[in-house]
């Protein structure tokens, strides 16, 4: 098996979705984050989606009125952020689309090496403040590192099957548990650092392609950003790997504080 890959979207699949490839297709049994379920609409009000035109690139997380966290490997020259979405095709009121004016990857992220997943974190400054309410609001950053066995929630519009890819219209959620760091290191020898945390489940719940940049939420606080994992996704012995937010709190607060 080749190197585990980042979990950014394949945009041509999203274009098929917009073009009606799902018409007449029953999604009840398969439209889930692997091992997950459709989220209760707007239950993840911090969830963001990164778009380049009409192409879904990655997920993201609203952490301030005009700040979104995502994965550094999602960086593009130009994109917009959508907030308040549940269905990507149908609008139901709270959706907002705001251009990104500045992308700030972590300074130690190595964009020239596709095999280096360390420091996979990026802040996006939005042109305008988001209109906040019950369906669009920032999430709190965890003030401590998570512990093995802790139950957490992941969410995104990534593929719901693997290796065959099917991208859902609605936001999907899954419940996962934090892996001990040693078990994570054993699953991916030589690839795991303190800046990463692993999460998965014995039932194969996992994030996958298209979920990159989305949140790992534990006890209502942001603990991780979807980064990379096994290919195919959903292997109980190969958990999803997330950027470990607790290791980057100082950097996040410094950037947001300096930019206002």
Swiss-Prot record:
Its EC number is 3.4.21.118. Residues 33-257 form the Peptidase S1 domain. Residues 29-32 form a propeptide. Isoform 1 is predominantly expressed in the pancreas. Isoform 2 is expressed in adult brain and hippocampus. Isoform 1 and isoform 2 are found in fetal brain and placenta. Detected in salivary gland, uterus, thymus, breast, testis and kidney but not in spleen, liver, lung or normal ovarian tissue. Displays an 11.5-fold increase in Alzheimer disease hippocampus compared to controls and is overexpressed in some ovarian carcinomas. Inhibited by a range of serine protease inhibitors including antipain, aprotinin, leupeptin, benzamidine and soybean trypsin inhibitor. Expressed at high levels in serum, ascites fluid and tumor cytosol of advanced stage ovarian cancer patients and may serve as a marker of ovarian cancer. This is Kallikrein-8.
């Amino acid at each position: 098996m080749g190197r585990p890959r980042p979990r950014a979207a394949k945009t041509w699949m999203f274009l098929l979705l917009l073009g009606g490839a799902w018409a007449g297709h029953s999604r009840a049994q398969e439209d889930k984050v692997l091992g997950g379920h459709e989220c209760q609409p707007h239950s993840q009000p911090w969830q963001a989606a990164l778009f380049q035109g009409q192409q879904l690139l990655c997920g993201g997380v609203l952490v301030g009125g005009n700040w979104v966290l995502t994965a550094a490997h999602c960086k593009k020259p130009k994109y917009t952020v959508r907030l308040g979405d549940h269905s990507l095709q149908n609008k139901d009121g709270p959706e907002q689309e705001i251009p990104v004016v500045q992308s700030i990857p972590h300074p130690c992220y190595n964009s020239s090496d596709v095999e280096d997943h360390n420091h996979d974190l990026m802040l996006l400054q939005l042109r305008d403040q988001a209109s906040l309410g019950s369906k669009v609001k920032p999430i709190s950053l965890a003030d401590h590192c998570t512990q093995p066995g802790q139950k957490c929630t992941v969410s995104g519009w990534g593929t719901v099957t693997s290796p065959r890819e099917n991208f859902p219209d609605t936001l999907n959620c899954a419940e996962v548990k934090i892996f001990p760091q040693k078990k994570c290191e054993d699953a991916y020898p030589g690839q795991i650092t303190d800046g990463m945390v692993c999460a998965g489940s014995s039932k194969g719940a996992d994030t996958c392609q298209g979920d990159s940049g989305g949140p790992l939420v534990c006890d209502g606080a942001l603990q991780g950003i979807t980064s990379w994992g096994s290919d195919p996704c959903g292997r109980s012995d190969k958990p999803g790997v997330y950027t470990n937010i607790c290791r980057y709190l100082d950097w996040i607060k410094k950037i947001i504080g300096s930019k206002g």
